[in-house]
């Protein structure tokens, strides 16, 4: 299983909200798990992608080379892979998860979100979120999810604009996101079974 986001950004700015924030959250989630002495039953990989902005080439290359897909053939790791959680929608706080049409995970994620209800993390969107690295997994029939976030000024001011700079980052929101991501990763890594896959 894995958590992560993409390293590359558009050339007009430093890419603070797209997607240095997502990378920082994934790194901090791993640091949290290490700091609390977590002993997960499954390996948790941090997956930091190149060339997301050029068509998800980093994540799609990883899936193609290491996991495969049912149409073209799978690797031995395909059946063992559990889930990938992604952050790539700006600096805003997590509010839930896009389910990508996988209703089998609804009760699982709902239970995992309960400790964060007081922070407003309570939404499970039935809709698919497109255009970022979890899609490489989802399109190969593997569980891949993007967290649902507050938009802040993401689409209006920072997304692919020259204003995507450090002072637009909201540190307190990113701290909450790191805790939620760490919790989801730990829960997924401690399950007896991989995360359920949606019907194809």
Task: Name every feature range the model reports, one short phrase each.
Residues 28-38, 63-71, 114-121, 139-142, ...:
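Sec-exported extracytoplasmic/periplasmic mature domains
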Residues 11, 49-158:
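Metal-dependent peptidase/peptidase-like ectodomains
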Residues 31, 35, 42-45, 154-200:
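His/Asp/Glu-rich mid-to-C-terminal helical/loop segments that flank catalytic regions of hydrolases
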Residues 39-51, 79-87, 194-200:
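Acidic/histidine-enriched alpha-helical segments
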Residues 16-24, 38, 53-57, 103, ...:
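Soluble non-cytosolic domains of exported or imported proteins
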